[in-house]
Every structure is written in structure tokens, then in C-alpha cells.
A protein has these predicted regions:
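An acidic-aromatic
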Residues: 67-128
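Gly/Pro-enriched, hydrophobic low-complexity segments
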Residues: 160, 164-233
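N-terminal leader/targeting segments and the immediate start of mature chains
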Residues: 6, 15-70, 74, 229-233
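Short, surface-exposed coil-to-beta transition loops
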Residues: 56-64, 85-91, 96, 186-190, ...
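Extended lipid/amphipathic-ligand handling interfaces
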Residues: 30-34, 63-70, 92, 96-99, ...
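Beta-turn initiation residues at beta-strand->coil junctions
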Residues: 45-49, 79-83, 102-106, 206-212
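Positively charged n-region of N-terminal signal peptides that target proteins for export
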Residues: 1-8
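Flexible, processing/modification-adjacent segments and terminal tails
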Residues: 105-165
Length: 233
């Protein structure tokens, strides 16, 4: 009798283990599908490039946060631009194919505007620019072994593992997007997708790239939350 009970328990363990594995794979496919189909959200983006020369350093970049819609591309955000160790507050808008920038320079308000490139190729387009949204990275969701999985209630976080093979995959995706060469750079990354297993929706996308070489270092961070929220510009 005891052997029969142990046999049943072992069988249930195998079945439940299989279900759990399938559940993880299913969630990863939902994440991939949702990421490809994301329509809008609250985007936060930051780029900081520091160059050191003759005992001095120069910071160039920006940080921005606001609501964004992707098709057609529309944006309403605010933040700062950094240049030559000075920072300028900015407001950014994209509407009807035109990019508007409001900046405060030397206590004066200055407006600029320019057309958005064909195909919505714009530095503030999260869906186009974020490493987490590139095809080569999204395809890594097809293999659950690429991801560390943590659960907090209904929230499931998938974090891309740190291996030499995956680092090369991230490099390849970034080089394909930017055409920059990274052979001589120290390179690190964070890529996460947060999924709600109850609503079966992706809740947040996070990525960070760090690369540096002698005399320069660059950090790129971005995130998207409140995914598919209504956005009015």
C-alpha cells in the first residue's frame, strides 16, 4: 500500500512539474506577444555619456519621462538635457509627425521643431529604441533557460541571465540597431519583463546597458509601464 501511495505521489510530482514548466513557457510567449503589440505607456529614458580627457570630464545626454503612443508616434514628456557639464530643462512633444522641444536656456524659453523621420525612427521612441524591444532580444523569450524567474504574488519577473553567450546576443542586437562597434568595451546589461499572471498582461519593461572603454563610459536606461494606457497629446 505504501509503495502504491509513493507511486501516486511521484506521478503527481512529475505531472505538476511538467505543468509548471509549461506555465513558464506560456507566460514567456505572452510576454513576447504583448511586447510586440504594445501600443502606449509611460516611458522613462536616460542616456549618459561621459568622456574624460586631461583630468577633466564632459557629460552628454538626457533623461526624460512621459506618456507615449507608438502608432502613430505621439509623445508628451519632460526632463533634462546634459551638455558640456550644463543641464537644461526640457519639454518634448510629438504630434502629427512633428517634434517640438521647449528648453530653458539662460533663463530664456526657446522652442524648436522638426519633422519626425519616416517610419517613426526617433531617439525618444521607446518601442523603436529600447534594447528590450529588439527582435533579437524578444526571440530569447522562446527559451525559458535564458531567464531567471522570480515571483511576488501575481507578479512574475523574467530577468535575462548573465552568460557569455547571452551577452554576445545582447551585443549583436545593439550593434544591429546602432551599427556601433563594441569589441573593445567592457559591456553589461539588465533586461527585465514583469508579467501579471492573474490578468495575463505585461506590466513593465526595463532595460539598462553599460559599456565603457579607456576614456569614456555610457549608460542607457529605459522603462515602460502603465502599458497600453490612454495617451492624449
Amino acid at each position: 500500500m505504501r509503495k502504491q501511495i509513493l507511486g501516486v505521489m511521484l506521478g503527481l510530482s512529475v505531472v505538476l512539474s511538467g505543468c509548471s514548466s509549461q506555465s513558464t513557457e506560456s507566460m514567456l510567449q505572452e510576454v513576447k506577444k504583448d511586447a510586440k503589440e504594445v501600443k502606449s505607456g509611460k516611458a522613462t529614458m536616460m542616456l549618459s555619456s561621459i568622456k574624460e580627457n586631461n583630468n577633466s570630464s564632459r557629460n552628454l545626454g538626457f533623461e526624460i519621462s512621459g506618456d507615449e503612443k507608438f502608432d502613430p508616434l505621439e509623445l508628451k514628456a519632460s526632463g533634462k538635457t546634459f551638455h558640456s557639464n550644463k543641464s537644461y530643462e526640457t519639454e518634448d512633444y510629438i504630434k502629427d509627425g512633428v517634434y517640438y522641444i521647449k528648453s530653458n536656456i539662460d533663463s530664456k524659453t526657446v522652442w524648436y521643431k522638426r519633422k519626425v523621420p519616416v517610419g517613426n525612427k526617433h531617439i525618444l521612441n521607446f518601442k523603436d529604441q529600447s534594447i528590450s524591444m529588439q527582435e533579437g532580444i524578444l526571440n530569447l523569450l522562446d527559451n525559458k533557460d535564458n531567464w531567471d524567474v522570480t515571483k511576488d504574488g501575481d507578479k512574475v519577473t523574467f530577468k535575462l541571465k548573465k552568460t557569455d553567450e547571452l551577452k554576445n546576443k545582447v551585443k549583436e542586437a545593439y550593434i544591429k540597431k546602432t551599427t556601433w562597434k563594441l569589441e573593445n568595451y567592457d559591456f553589461d546589461y539588465i533586461i527585465e519583463y514583469i508579467y501579471n499572471s492573474k490578468t495575463k498582461d505585461i506590466e513593465k519593461i526595463v532595460s539598462e546597458l553599460n559599456y565603457k572603454t579607456s576614456g569614456s563610459s555610457t549608460i542607457i536606461k529605459d522603462s515602460l509601464e502603465e502599458i497600453n494606457k490612454e495617451v492624449k497629446v
